Regions:
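Extracytoplasmic substrate-binding proteins
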Residues: 120, 164, 177, 181-275, ...
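Bacterial Sec-exported substrate-binding components of ABC uptake systems
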Residues: 40-129, 240-266
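Alpha-helical, coiled-coil/dimerization segments enriched in small aliphatic residues
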Residues: 277-306
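Bacterial N-terminal signal peptides that target proteins for export
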Residues: 4-26
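Short, solvent-exposed loop/turn and secondary-structure capping segments
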Residues: 132-136, 199-200, 281
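Bacterial N-terminal signal peptides
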Residues: 26-37
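A short, structured surface patch at a secondary-structure boundary
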Residues: 84-90, 94-180, 186-193
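Short, structured coil segments at secondary-structure junctions
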Residues: 137, 206-207, 292
Length: 307
């Protein structure tokens, strides 16, 4: 009887050993699967932030464009994947890419690459400053082509007084060393730069992209105002720019719908030398008077843009 008991006891012990093994194996397998799934999930989450460039320019095409109401001196095209092509005038093109994305293969040398949002701007075109102020994007400007005393906009003057924006020389004599040391991402020049093309060429040789602000060439007065939409794209504040532009257009809708009053108006200014300048009929001031329902005089002042 004792032998039978001992045999049964040994059998129970032998059967008890393998019984725990499947449990441990199942637990190990479940743990391994959970680790694999976690790894897959981590890789999926990380992939978007590691985008560099898998594009070839020849295979890329616009999927949409900014619907401009008045401006004709710039255009903005959407190429998908947060890639934007900006054209200024007839030939200056800029490809605005997400941060850390490299340029597409086969991109023509005539297209300048910018990384969004554009930072440490060297702002020479004074007419653009108001747009940056309204967009609350002064922090994207590091350098100014106008001295502190030359600004009539209090926000710009204060930024220079506080050292947030530094003077880097006027359009014809920029401080190249200061511009380079500031890691300048873009120089926004006025059309005066066309009188000193060697400066533009030198900036570009140093790797500083140059965008010439052509709002003064707009045929419609409200085309100038629409440039805020371009600066919204450059600074990553598209929604703010659209809202500001819409608000301004809406506020003028009643005026634009008015029947011409038949009243005449003249506009002139006195220069530092004491001479009197009269705006010509093709000037934006004359067109603004016409939009308001008036008639600009003198009517035989010519049709050129300048005074």
């Amino acid at each position: 009887m004792d032998n039978i008991k001992n045999h049964l006891f040994r059998q129970k012990r032998k059967s008890a050993i393998p019984c725990g093994q499947p449990v441990r194996w199942i637990a190990a397998i479940l743990l391994l699967l959970s680790m694999i799934c976690a790894g897959c999930s981590a890789k999926t989450e990380e992939s978007p932030s590691n985008i560099t460039s898998a594009h070839n320019w020849d295979d890329m095409a616009p999927v949409g464009s900014m619907d401009l109401l008045y401006a004709d001196q710039f255009s903005v095209e959407d190429y998908g994947d947060d890639i934007t092509l900006i054209t200024i005038g007839e030939s200056d093109r800029f490809l605005l890419l997400p941060e850390n994305m490299s340029a597409p293969d086969g991109l023509p040398d005539s297209i300048t690459v910018l990384q969004k949002p554009v930072k440490n701007i060297y702002l020479v075109a004074t007419s653009a400053m108001d747009a940056f102020i309204r967009l609350n994007a002064l922090d994207s400007i590091a350098l100014s082509g106008t001295k502190e005393s030359g600004w009539y906009l209090p926000e710009a003057k204060s930024a220079m007084e506080e050292g947030k924006i530094a003077y880097a020389g006027k359009y014809s004599a920029p401080d190249y060393e200061k511009i380079l040391n500031s890691s300048c991402g873009l120089a926004v020049e006025s059309t005066m730069i066309y009188h000193t093309p060697e400066v533009k060429e030198q900036l570009e040789r140093l790797g500083i992209p140059v965008l010439v602000e052509r709002s003064s060439y707009e045929n419609h007065p409200l085309g100038r105002m629409e440039w805020i939409r371009l600066y919204g794209v450059l600074t990553g504040k598209e929604e703010e720019a659209e809202a500001i532009f819409k608000q301004n257009v809406d506020s003028l809708s009643d005026v634009l719908d008015m029947v011409p009053s038949g009243k005449t108006a003249a506009f002139f200014y006195v220069t530092n030398s004491g001479s009197v300048n009269v705006r010509k009929n093709g000037d934006y001031i004359a067109k603004m008077i016409a939009l308001a329902g008036g008639t600009y005089v003198p009517e035989n002042g010519g049709s050129d843009e300048n005074a």
